[in-house]
Amino acid sequence: MKRIILTYTLAFSLLSAYAGEGGSPPLKNTDKSLLIDYVDPFIGTTNFGTTNPGAICPNGMMSVVPFNVMGSSENTYDKDARWWSTPYEYTNCFFTGYAHVNLSGVGCPELGSLLLMPTTGELNVDYKEYGSKYKDEQASPGYYSNYLTKYNVKTEVSATPRSGI
């Protein structure tokens, strides 16, 4: 009985070794795209999806996100109490600043955000006055930018695990 088990074990070992050695050559990756190229930060940023396309570092302490849900008659959710659940709504185009500690996709209010707004000219603290329409919005993992038409300024933010700039 031991001889039969030993014979089968030896045969199986030889076949396994041969199967690993031979066969077709290893496949080469001819596609030069990276997995990061398939990420769309704008998924879930409308219809109260509560996500944002900001500069966010995975598992990091910092998330620099655009705030655009208040301040303009063109914003569809400005007078709706539900806008408190998210700092960003894709269909709105009135930018009021960057928040640095918002979470994405939590589905509940995140109040008390300190907004930073790049502006030029006289200081104005009324968000309906200092806010600006924007265009040329771009986002990728860890990066967000837009162009503020009122101030003729391109804004860019990025995040690392412990800081955002």
What is each PLM-predicted segment?
Residues S16-K28:
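Bacterial Sec-dependent signal peptides at the C-terminal "C-region" and cleavage site
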Residues M1-I4:
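Positively charged n-region of N-terminal signal peptides that target proteins for export
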Residues L6-T7, T86:
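General helical structural elements
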Residues T7-S16:
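Bacterial N-terminal signal peptides
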Residues P25-I165:
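Accessory carbohydrate-recognition regions in carbohydrate-active enzymes
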